């Protein structure tokens, strides 16, 4: 089991990235916080050491994406009606970034993943291919298609 110092170090290093991945996938602050906690619990129980900081970062990205997918899969099987909650994140954003965020969040999951990892986490296509377990050319194709969709939906100043 990891020490408190290890946990503090990775929290300082990866917390923002993990939160952003959670929100991009789940689109809900409360669910994102639950998955965020699950990711760090998995880290605490993770026995293996990491080969490098890049390996550790990729591990956090992959585990977070998997945890979000598991969360969505679990709740998609449940019949429930969500409570009407004001989406705090959207209210806090200005109109321009809010419009961009809405369009990015509306992308299919595979495109959201590559856009996030490429532009926000600054991974290369080769690194994204490794994280997602896809071929490099697939990542390039998804990036191109995602950009085309964003250009079509945003138009105007974004084109």
Predicted regions and their residues:
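A short, charge-rich alpha-helical start-of-domain segment used by transcription regulators
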Residues: 1-20, 33, 44, 112
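C-terminal flanking helix
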Residues: 15, 19, 40, 108, ...
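Sigma70-family region 2
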Residues: 27, 38-55, 74-75
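Structural recognition of an alpha-helix C-terminal capping motif at a helix-to-coil junction
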Residues: 34-41, 54-66
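Arg/Lys-rich amphipathic alpha helix in sigma70-family domain 2
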Residues: 51, 62-83
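DNA-recognition helix of helix-turn-helix
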Residues: 65, 69, 132-157
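Acidic, proline/glycine-rich intrinsically disordered inter-domain spacer in sigma factors
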Residues: 78-105
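A short pre-motif secondary-structure segment
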Residues: 114-118
């Amino acid at each position: 089991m990891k020490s408190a110092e290890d946990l503090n170090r990775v929290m300082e290093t990866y917390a923002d990235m993990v939160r952003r991945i959670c929100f991009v996938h789940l689109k809900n602050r409360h669910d994102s916080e639950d998955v965020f906690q699950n990711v760090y619990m998995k880290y605490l129980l993770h026995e293996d050491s990491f080969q490098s900081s890049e390996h550790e970062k990729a591990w956090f990205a992959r585990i977070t994406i998997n945890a979000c997918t598991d969360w969505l899969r679990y709740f998609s099987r449940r019949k429930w009606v969500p409570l009407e909650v004001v989406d705090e994140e959207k209210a806090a954003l200005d109109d321009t970034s809010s419009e961009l965020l809405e369009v990015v969040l509306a992308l299919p999951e595979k495109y959201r993943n590559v856009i996030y990892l490429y532009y926000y986490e600054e991974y290369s296509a080769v690194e994204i291919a490794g994280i997602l377990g896809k071929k490099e050319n697939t990542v390039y194709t998804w990036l191109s298609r995602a950009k085309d969709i964003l250009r079509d939906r945003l138009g105007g100043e974004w084109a």
